[in-house]
Every structure is written in C-alpha cells, then in structure tokens.
C-alpha cells in the first residue's frame, strides 16, 4: 500500500512517499500534457481550415480542459494527503525554488486551459468538450482572441521549459544529491523499501 487512511478519514502518505492518488494523478497528467503539446505541434501537418487540423486542435482543447479539471483534484489530494519530507533535507534555497517551480506548474495547468477557452469564446467558435458544448466565457471579440492567443502561445513555450526543468531537477536530486525526491513520486518502490 502506498497510502493509508488516518482517523480523520483523509489519506496520508507513507513516511517516504506521496499517496497513491497523488502519484497516479502526477503521471496521468504528465501523459495528458504530453498529448496536449503533441496535438498542437502536430497540427502543422495539415493545411489551415482542413478537417484533420481542426480535429487535432479540438483534441488539444479537450485534453487541455481535462488537465484543468484534474488539477483541482490533484491539488485536493496533495492538500489532504500531505507532502512527505525530502531526505536528506535540501538547502533552504532549493526548497524555495522547488515551491516556486510547483506553483508555476500549477498556475500553468490552471491558466492555459482557461486561456484556450477564452480564445475560442472571443473568436466566436464552438467550445467542445467530449460531446458537450461549453458556454462562452466572453462575447465575440476577434482582437481579444488574437491577444490571448499570443499570450497562450508564449505561456506554452514557457511550459516546455518548466516541465523540462522539473524533470531535470528530479533527476539531479536522484542521481547527484542522492535524496528521495524522485522516489517520493515514483510508480515503483525501491526493492527492500
């Protein structure tokens, strides 16, 4: 077992790992984010206005909104389940940078889908979500749609860097600092652990 219920009915991590809901959501959301980025990058394989390009952009949006929905569940799991300590304890500045990185990633997973929803709303386009059509957040305003789209694209590039730095930091902690940062979120337990 990766986690156990305490007397208050909340899940608490074993002393050296996050709880299983948090671990599952971390890796599942990574797969979703990879799919979101893949969809938007692969759209260039088809001409503008073509059905395949529109379909892959629709998937980009729907998967992005899925990230938005799941990030709230993930935050709840993290708050209720707690955060196991990093052993050995890193320097205070590393802890601060880690907190800032996590805050930036959560902000990205919340703001980017909302920006996508605003873009489609302002462009006057349908807002699909797996068979549903969501209401627009703002009225039609093509200039606003273009402005938000520029911000969305820039933030998407920043997202690549944030995700890459997050992965690099976890590998640095594991292979250079030899602490349990990576293993706290690993799908597999160390043998004998």
What are the roles of these predicted feature ranges?
Residues 2-193:
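Membrane-embedded alpha-helical bundles that constitute the cytochrome b-like, heme-associated redox core
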